[in-house]
């Protein structure tokens, strides 16, 4: 299964380094040197092997093997980056999920009233925050007091909203 792991937002310097906005989890594994990433550009799949990875100002800075010049990579700005998930050997703990399994789930309150769909996830340090969108956008902390049930197979999440969370 191929999952989107980020988007190339810009280049950095003249030696072919790119800035990637990640929309994925386990970036320390996904972007480590030697990992193969697929960049989709003009409906073409281009495979690249990660040469180096570092984090700078909240963005992931990557270089690819065989790319040593900004001119070789600049045309990929705005392109999405994918990775095969089938080969992952990441062991998930209880109540830990891949972002790609959570994004797209429908969120309901504990009365089974639909609230919206998870459209994004971001990390805050203490816990992840799920961005839920329907007619409004809500920020739902992924904590036990709020998220009561996650059914990945049926793409369904049940929450008990704290006071003011959905206002």
UniProtKB/Swiss-Prot annotation:
Gene coding for it:
rimM
Record key words, sorted: Chaperone, Cytoplasm, Ribosome biogenesis, rRNA processing
Report quaternary structure and partners: Binds ribosomal protein uS19.
Q: Please verify whether the record's keywords include Chaperone.
A: yes
Q: Which cell locations does it reside in?
A: Cytoplasm
Signal peptide residues are: none
What domain notes does the record hold? The PRC barrel domain binds ribosomal protein uS19.
Q: What is the lineage of its organism?
A: Bacteria, Bacillati, Bacillota, Bacilli, Bacillales
Domain (PRC barrel) ranges:
94-165
Q: Which species is this UniProt entry from? A: Staphylococcus aureus (strain MRSA252)
- Protein name per UniProt: Ribosome maturation factor RimM
Q: What does this protein do?
A: An accessory protein needed during the final step in the assembly of 30S ribosomal subunit, possibly for assembly of the head region. Essential for efficient processing of 16S rRNA. May be needed both before and after RbfA during the maturation of 16S rRNA. It has affinity for free ribosomal 30S subunits but not for 70S ribosomes.
The entry sums up its family as follows: Belongs to the RimM family.
Q: Name one GO biological process term.
A: ribosomal small subunit biogenesis
Concerning NCBIfam families, the annotation shows:
16S_RimM (TIGR02273)
Q: Which GO terms of the cellular component aspect does the record hold?
A: cytoplasm; ribosome
Q: Record's superkingdom?
A: Bacteria
Q: Which GO terms describe its molecular function?
A: ribosome binding
